[in-house]
Amino acid sequence: WYMVQSGLVNNVDVSHFRLSIHLLFAFIILSLILWNYFILNHDEKYEKNLINYLPEILLFLIFLQIVIGAFVSGMDAGKIYNSWPLMGNSYFPDDNNLLNLFKISAFSDPSLVQFIHRNLAYLISFIYLILIVIVYKKNINKLFKPINVLGLIILLQIILGILTVLTGAGIIIASLHQFSSILLISS
């Protein structure tokens, strides 16, 4: 009701902030269910250091990406800057100032939200690449399949994200992009 109520006052669109909170709670519930399942089926302990925290960092960034994706969806930000890899004619949206990126109002600006969503995807991909190199370098055989599945889902999500941008957030591609985020958080 909290989310829907925002669309009943002044305009018919729901608040992108409330939409993202609603979505985030759904993903937290799903993740807790999966986390408990995996903990019950896994009793191995390992030393915590920066490298071993990378999966948690990656998971946090994926959650953040889903929230920013809800902002993109709620603001129809996917319908602007329908080019990739550039946003129009430049890396940074030309309707904005770089300094605006560091203001809280950036989360209410469609072009900046799309910029953040794109760049967070690049960061997630980079951290994934670090993880896969570590897994293969340390020859952790039991993680080969899960890390490869994760990589395929990240690749699927990136391809669907690019297609979503190029199609101006066409409903079928955009819906597949949103659905594959469930696969991503579940992997």
PLM region spans:
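Polytopic transmembrane helical bundles with strong interfacial aromatic enrichment
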Residues: 1-187
